[in-house]
Amino acid sequence: KPKIITAIGMFYDLEKPNEFIKDASLALDDKGIFIAQLMCLKTMIKKNDLGNICHEHLEFYSLKSLKYLFENNGLEIFKIQENDINGGSYRIFCRKLNKGSIKLNEGNILKAINNFVKRVKKNRLQTTNFINKKIREGKKVFLYGASTKGNTVLQYYNLNKKIIPFAAERSPEKWGKYTIGTGIKIISEKMARDLKPDYFLVTPWGFIKEFV
C-alpha cells in the first residue's frame, strides 16, 4: 500500500469527494499520509477572490467542512500549512482516523461570507466607476492576462469588448481568441504595448509578482 497519496490543485473539482477520500483511506498504508493542496473558503473570503468562483470549482471548503468530510471517510487532519499558491492555499496533511483532527478555528463563517458579498459589490462599483471615468476621459484600458478566473470577474462587473477592447496574454495558444461571455480579443503582450494603453486591469493577480 502507498505511504503517501497526494491531491494537488484538484480537490475542489471532485464530483464525488466522499467516495474519493474513502478510496484514498482504504488504499493508504496504516502509517501513510494523505496530502491535499487546495484553495479554501477562508482565503477566498479574506482576499475578496471572486474569480475563484468559476465553472471548474465545484466546492468551496471551510476548515470545518474539511474536518467533517475527512473524518466521515476514515481520515483525520493532523497538520495544515498555508502558502501563496493561486493567491493563497492550504496544504492539508491527513492520516488514518484515530483520535480526531487537530482543533480548527475559523470564527463565524456565515458572517464572513455576508461581509464578503458586501465587499465584492463595493469593489465592482469602485472598479467600474474608475474604468468608465477613464474611458470618458479618452484613456485606453486593457486587460493583463486572459485567465479562467478573470472571466468570472469580467462577467460579474459587466466589462466587455465595448469597454475593454484587448487582453494582453503571454500564452501564444490564446492569441486571436476571445474572453468567454465578454468577447474581449486576446493579443500578445508586445502587440498590447505597441497600442500604448493607459491602464491594465490585472486578472491573474495571484501571479502578479511574476510580471510586475
Language-model features: locations:
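Hydrophobic adenine-recognition pocket in adenosine-nucleotide-binding enzymes
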Residues: 10
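Short hydrophobic/aromatic beta-strand or adjacent loop that forms the aromatic wall/cage
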Residues: 87-92
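Conserved S-adenosyl-L-methionine
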Residues: 75-86
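Short conserved AdoMet
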Residues: 15, 29, 136
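A short glycine-rich, Lys/Arg-flanked "PGG" loop and its adjoining helix->strand segment in the class I
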Residues: 18-35
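Hydrophobic, well-ordered beta-alpha structural blocks that scaffold small-molecule cofactor pockets
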Residues: 93-212
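A conserved beta-strand element that flanks and buttresses the S-adenosyl-L-methionine
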Residues: 3-7
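Short, glycine-/aromatic-enriched active-site segment of Class I SAM-dependent methyltransferases
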Residues: 36-59, 63-65
